[in-house]
Amino acid sequence: MTKQRRTFTPEFKREAACLVLDQGYSHAEAARSLGLVESALRRWVNQLQQERGGVTPASKALTPEQQKIQELEARITRVERLRLRSRVNELFTRGRSAPGSRTIMAMMQEEGEQIGRFKVRSLMRELALISKQPGSHAYKKATVERPDIPNTLNRAFDVEAPNQVWCGDITYVWAQGKWHYLAVVLDLYARRVVGWALSEKPDGDLVVKALDVAYEQRGKPQGLLFHSDQGSQYGSRQFRQRLWRYRMRQSMSRRGNCWDNAPMERVFRSLKSEWIPTTGYLTGQQAQRDIGQYLMGHYNWIRPHQFNDGLAPAKAEEKLKTVSGMS
């Protein structure tokens, strides 16, 4: 038969310690009179001495004053946790149920919050928040090789400054009961979206319009390298003439090799898994407005990017300007 372990209230522990501290009992005498193990009594005596000196213990307090402090601290902890829960829920909702614990942690740290991924994960679990997981991604494959346009970039995705290398690609979006086509231009330096266009036709006009937007918004840079897959739109005379007019060089991925344009694939993966409704959009105008909000707002300015050590692309560029004095 196992011996049942004795439990003691804080009041009993305090009175036992007072026998030693206030009434002159030795540790051995007090322990013997109360039927205690002397080592336990010594712990209580030490704790009571510390509490009388103003130290709040990690274990349950013995004095009424320190018990009150512990109650207040527990209340503050509860209020703080409720505040953090509320912020986690706000960020999760704003991200359309897509952000995971790492992304939310980065967002909160950027706001000045001292919080780790374990706590964020715990708060998400309490709130029953489950990040949407992206499904499989189907890559387009070119059917015609373009030996006249080499893969100059050759997966050198790390560049030293903005407006040195841009990437482009096209994806499809369901809106108004039919497919629409989205062309995006990405600056590789901080993975910032610098231009985009949406159309009902995946033609040369679409990619030219996205390039025109990027060219104007970025101050008409020249001499940069534009990289894309081997889609016919990017190999069209219309697009290549526009590159020539803007004094841009052209690079193309190898046929059927999606990894040669991996940064663009990631943008589209994030857009579709995090933002676009699974049923698509009711109208083309709604798609235009919502996709623009994601690319130029949420993706560029809010969403943390691992490539930028948790900074959103636009903020990573701003940081470069601050450090280097660029205008």
Which residues does each predicted region cover?
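Residue-centric detector for conserved, function-critical "anchor" positions
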Residues: 1-83, 251, 324-327
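Charged DNA-binding/catalytic regions of mobile-element recombinases
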Residues: 2, 27, 65-327
